[in-house]
């Protein structure tokens, strides 16, 4: 069982001890992320976090990387709208020096001008390279369209234009804003005791300065009416990417788990409605799914597919028809019985390792989820009835008020797609390489 404990200065710690393997996983997170980037400085939070391992406390970037390798460790970074997390793993005998290294990275980053210039160039190149991924383009366009005017529309990675304007003062300001002790959440999993975790947690928390906590609780996103098509125009696309969606769920909704369960019927398994109709019957897309994302505020419901260019228009038409049927008629008793059994049984794979169990506890803390969100997941699913599942789909979702994203070649595909969308309210064509 994951144990929660308080650390100095308002930081919070977790430990999930296990002797299964001689490894220790750790995570150091803060309760703020890209939502707090200043206007015109999109990407600066992630930029500052990446700079932590590019020089600290007299160590160069090369020396830091060599130390990580020598310890047999791994260290990765994840930056989202509301959180920043450093994830590490190391063999047990090297926990002490690994924690010492991370303490130095957190507490005394150098932010050398030459490293900032190098990372600025690398980030700009990565953003350009990301345009090679049609899926990434679809996700970016969807987020910007669905959450237009809301902080959730912004990309943690930033834009080429904003990255170009990031200077050292911006990086230092972002570091000082986000890395404050009262916002720190630290977790350990694996071959480590509770006493050891508390001792190492105190060392890590002490490395971070005390300061004013960041308020990253954005307003509730606004629902936008009508079917709105955004076509991301990219040359020579023989395959397309589609995303159809709207606002979805919030973990504190009374009907959250009924909607999660119903959505799994629509597109959450290999035998879901979408897989059966789009892949198995018609062969239009190898993969297709529906999902709900969670955040501190209501986030997105999405349906995705990747049909060939010739099949894109009928595939979009079918997805909209499936959504209309799902919202209007709901799911069947047989479908509900199957999906509840599937979700309950497969949950074992969500908690079969100490790092996974730790991850659930940390996520609950960071995203302010209900305290029993993960610990009583199975009970929540079992409590879903046909009435609550269908009411949730009908209440929370709409087939009439959706964003429709297509990444393809407009000259070949746009007109056909438009003809297959009844009651289309608007169309925007966006160049794939737009900032």
Regions from the PLM with identified roles:
Residues 2, 185-191, 302, 340-435:
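C-terminal regions of mature proteins
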Residues 1-24:
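N- or domain-start disorder-to-order transition segments that initiate the globular core
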Residues 10, 28, 46-48, 68, ...:
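Buried hydrophobic packing residues in well-ordered domains
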Residues 148, 152, 156, 180-181, ...:
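An aromatic/glycine/proline-enriched structural segment found at the starts
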Residues 54-58, 88-122, 269, 289, ...:
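M16/insulysin-pitrilysin zinc metalloprotease superfamily fold
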Residues 25-92, 132, 155, 268-284, ...:
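M16/MPP (pitrilysin/insulinase) zinc-metallopeptidase core fold and M16-derived inactive scaffolds
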Residues 65-174, 195, 203, 220-222, ...:
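Acidic/histidine-enriched segments that form metal/cofactor-coordinating
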Residues 1-5, 126, 144-184, 216-221, ...:
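Histidine-acidic residue clusters that define the catalytic metal-binding segment
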């Amino acid at each position: 069982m994951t144990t929660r404990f308080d650390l100095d200065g308002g930081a919070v710690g977790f430990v999930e001890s296990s002797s299964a393997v001689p490894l220790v996983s750790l995570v150091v997170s803060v309760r703020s992320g890209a939502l707090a980037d200043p206007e015109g400085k999109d990407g600066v939070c992630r930029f500052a976090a990446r700079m932590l391992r590019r020089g600290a406390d007299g160590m160069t970037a090369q020396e830091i990387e060599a130390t990580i390798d020598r310890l047999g460790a791994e260290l990765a970074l994840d930056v989202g709208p509301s959180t920043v997390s450093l994830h590490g793993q190391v063999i047990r005998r090297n926990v002490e020096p690994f924690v010492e290294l991370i303490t130095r990275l957190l507490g005394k980053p150098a932010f050398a001008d030459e490293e900032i210039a190098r990372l600025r160039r690398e980030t700009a190149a990565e953003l350009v390279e990301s345009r090679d991924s049609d899926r990434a383009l679809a996700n970016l366009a969807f987020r910007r369209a669905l959450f237009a005017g809301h902080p959730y529309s912004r990309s943690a990675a930033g834009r080429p234009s904003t990255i170009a304007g990031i200077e050292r003062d911006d990086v230092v300001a972002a570091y000082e804003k986000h890395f404050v002790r009262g916002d720190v959440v630290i977790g350990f999993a694996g071959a480590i005791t509770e006493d050891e975790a508390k001792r190492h947690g105190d060392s890590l928390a002490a490395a971070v300065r005390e300061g004013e906590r960041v308020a990253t609780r954005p307003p509730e996103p606004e629902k936008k009416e009508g079917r709105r098509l955004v076509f991301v125009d990219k040359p020579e696309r023989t395959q397309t990417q589609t995303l159809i969606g709207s606002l979805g769920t919030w973990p504190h909704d009374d009907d959250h788990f009924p909607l999660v369960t119903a959505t799994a019927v629509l597109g959450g398994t290999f035998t879901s409605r979408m897989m059966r109709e789009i892949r198995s019957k018609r062969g239009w897309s190898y993969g297709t799914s529906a999902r709900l994302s969670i955040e501190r505020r209501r986030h997105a419901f999405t349906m995705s597919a990747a049909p060939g260019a010739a099949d894109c228009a009928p595939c979009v038409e079918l997805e909209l028809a499936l959504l209309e049927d799902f919202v209007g008629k709901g799911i069947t008793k047989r479908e509900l019985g199957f999906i509840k059994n599937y979700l309950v049984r497969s949950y074992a794979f969500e908690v079969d390792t100490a790092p996974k169990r730790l991850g659930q506890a940390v996520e609950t803390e960071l995203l302010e989820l209900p305290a029993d969100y993960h610990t009583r997941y199975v009970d929540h699913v079992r409590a879903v009835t046909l009435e609550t599942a269908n009411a949730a789909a009908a209440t929370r979702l709409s087939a009439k008020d959706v964003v429709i994203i297509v990444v393809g070649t407009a000259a070949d595909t746009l007109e056909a797609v438009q003809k297959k969308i009844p009651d289309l309210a608007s169309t925007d064509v966006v160049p794939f390489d737009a900032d």
